[in-house]
């Protein structure tokens, strides 16, 4: 995390803590990892007044653009729906009700779409894998900038497809909420409990058996 991002993150944390909110969700790891990876988390509380600049959004998209890609096919297509726009309303309306409970606050919703065929019309076998890598890059870049993300799979794909004017060869895989973190007190009591719960992961021995 750069000095600028550290400053933004620190100021934001200080503001929330003065409101009685602790936004620190750093992962507790068994081995050292990059700080930006440890700090990445997926809150539901976003600042409802924040607006992202073109430069900020451009940096997020640039990070996705330079993620790894099978045969350099780059099958991802990213559609930015800024809060207050018609596209944002259409994408928001396509979200599952559980996501709608909080996803109106983030500064923007970014739809991650996979192009499922190659230029010659054959199946793009690694498209879904590659768009996941693009989303991961975007999320880590957001963390480095003092922002947070929350990736959602709960949405009506056909409604999003219609909103974006996509053909049958392009599939929406995720909607990514992006913006500065907000005060969890805006959430329902149930979501506040989930927001404040400690982060957990399966043990290394389970996900990587016999690695040593």
Regions found by a protein language model. Give the residues of each.
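Acidic, surface-exposed loops and disordered segments
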Residues: 8-12, 16-212
